[in-house]
Amino acid sequence: MFLSLSTPVQRYWLIGLLIVWAALLFGGFIFGGAPEAARRMPAWSRMASSAVLVVAAFSWYAFTRHTPAGAYALLVAIGMTFGLLGDLALAGFLPGGRNVIAGIISFGIGHIFYITAMLRLAAATGLTNPPARWGALAIWLLVGLAGWYLVVLRGANARGITPGVVHWIALPYALVLAATAGLATGLALQDSRFILLALGAALFLLSDLILAGEMFSGMTFRLIGDVIWLTYGPAQMLIVYSIAHVLARVNR
């Protein structure tokens, strides 16, 4: 993953950030609060793990900015920054306290940057096979629509909750996340280097469907908060570190 970088210092730095991210995320889970709670992981370790990924993403950009992978790295770095803002909004660390709609908007903007990065990558590298690209996109959009219907809309109705504005805002958001997964899958079908990118995008959608169920439909189970983060955190990491595979692709 790191062999396409120019110097050992760059490799060690990005590997080190990966280790710190894993220690914050998984260490926060292992050494967190009481196991009976909905979440063991403390808020500070969750926010810090996302902040480390922002640093990693901009480090990738700094190391690749003079290569054809630089544009992709910058778009991913900006997308990850909006992801961190979304985390802070949902955790209540921004002025005004917890703001679900602001969090959704931040994540949605982040994914628009991810989508733009993938579209530009596909155009630049010739990974534009129509069946792979549009077929994967169509399938994932259907998955996103079905997930929103079952988890958010039907889930709310089943619990006697009248769907409100935020439930309907969740629909285009789910479709944006599904589009990210679809485009990533399209890339992976044409170049196996991007399988981990596709996995990351799929995990992000899964994590957000669980989160939507918790917030909008009253879904609950033991350690649900940790399940959300143990899918979301690796999802963001795989998207950020996909820059390595882009660099390998353009340097071949």
What do the PLM-derived regions correspond to, one by one?
Residues 1-252:
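Polytopic alpha-helical membrane-helix bundles and their juxtamembrane interface segments
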